[in-house]
């Protein structure tokens, strides 16, 4: 198996890392930088520039240079955040046919996924150049507060870039992995990850625990704002400079896309400089021109002025932090460390606010630009099976279920369900007087259980003699915080139960997971055919059982010829069930039901007569009550999955 790389797909900058042994390595790009600007430029000749080269030509090509596209991914055009960006971005944002927010470049509409795929392709190439081998698998990070559409869109971007995205993980969780892996402190530690990046803000409360020599990372809570980040800080500076220049020169730079692109670059540079100095100059000669000639821009910006411009933005990070602390069920005093992630956390005022809120100095030993990519690389190593001392409480990679009648895989917990989780379903017996059931637990995506990986089996014995479909066997699946799967079966009638514990996720290598997903796709048609055949056989078996039972009770009321025809149809259907011809089974099943109509009529007439006799002449409501009771019983039966557990085979 090839390496699984870790990619931090950022709004402003992106980063790629791998693991060399147990040491993370952030890979330098072709320009020698450890981070790559998430900027993409589409040239007139069709060439696509990504990163620093795209950033350098942005001033002369503003309408075809895309940045901060991550803020559009998975969003609808009508969302207020998108509408806000339309008025700020030099490039065109358009509505797709499905209502999504797309971008328009050189007359072509493009999905944000396609644009992000160009950045991911650059990250992939950076890793391949370093490793000297093809890279096909990656763990990609997303803001913790991303919704399902945004997560799926990010995964699609990976696929477009030629990457098999093994996992989408949250940026704060990845940063916690990077921080906590080399820490030697014993006992459980709770950390807050404050992640203020280029376009999004997240805060997560995470518990790091030592469990039998493993480091366990459990996310207790998360909160954030997917439209708050460095881009907004830059915009405050741009707005300020535009206003000042208009006062001085009477010219509105906001209507000049070339000037705006230069301003964007200057604002970002000034913001960075003010993290280490008290004052900076924004100088843009020949920024524009009017009838009187060229205009030059020269403005002094102090740190104090910048802080006043962005005060409201910094304040917006506080409420999500308080909510996350509350949702985690902890007090501020319980938090051992605060980790800063994202370039904006280098701003002294942000650090000051974090210290004020959490009552402690934030840690400075985590690189805010690289920690997320490093964490993604660590998770990639865990997924590949090369690292077993780390447990990240995340999702189950494959569906979990049990084998039911006909070898069908009945899924209890579907893949990508967040763990810990619980699920229970009621099944019944397949035969009359069945004394025991065998519960076989499988993991995989195939519809037929045999195509999946069997994790274990156990018996539930001592079921009292009763007709098939009568006992109610509750099967429960429970994945706990350790990633351990507990399966139980309980007879609701007697209270008897049995349990088995399975280490669900450690039972598969990543290669097996890949193979199963591939098999599921390749064999989808074959599985569908087998599933349809099993269902036809189960339906036919139910018909046989029903007709045989009715024939025993009411057969003497039929003429000899009619009874013989039904018995002959029963034999034909029993023979058909032995084969694998679905159409033949359905044909014989239909024939049996058609020929059994006379038997049904006799049953109905007999029931009507009995009800009339019981009701009596003086109680006309009794018959209706009897009918209602029958309907109620039927409804209760409908809640039980009928005849779906095999009888245990005694050796």
UniProtKB/Swiss-Prot annotation:
Disulphide bridges, residue numbers: none
Sequence ranges of Low complexity compositional bias: 611-636
Region (Disordered): 608-651
Keywords: ATP-binding, Chaperone, Nucleotide-binding, Phosphoprotein, Stress response
Induction of its expression: By stress conditions e.g. heat shock.
One Gene Ontology MF term: ATP binding
List of residues that carry Phosphothreonine: 200
Function description: Acts as a chaperone.
Family listed: Belongs to the heat shock protein 70 family.
Annotated PANTHER family: HEAT SHOCK PROTEIN 70KDA
Protein name as catalogued: Chaperone protein DnaK
